Amino acid sequence: SIRIFTEANFKLRIYGPVVNPQVGIGGYPYLVNIMLEKGEYLEINSMKETVEKVAVNGERESVFHNRAKKKSIFKKVPPGKQEIVWPGTFDFDLLIYEERSEPKCQN
């Protein structure tokens, strides 16, 4: 689980091999209908609103049309403690962009 203080944008990177990967964050499903081979990865960036497949050679391809369309794949992660759920059959990295209007207090 993760704890977030304000609604936050994210970057989700899912590593192949995997077919139709889904990660649930706070009960919300982030799903892309795609097949990734070993060495490829999928990158969802909620801030830029992009969904890209990155090949072994680093070439990027937009796969925006492969996203699940019933729910927005760019929905920000809500504040609070959020459980992360996935089938455990693939690896992923989740980067949360916590933004503040004031700097953190330094003591």
What kind of region is each of these model predictions?
Residues 1-107:
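Intrinsically disordered, low-complexity segments enriched in serine, threonine, and glycine
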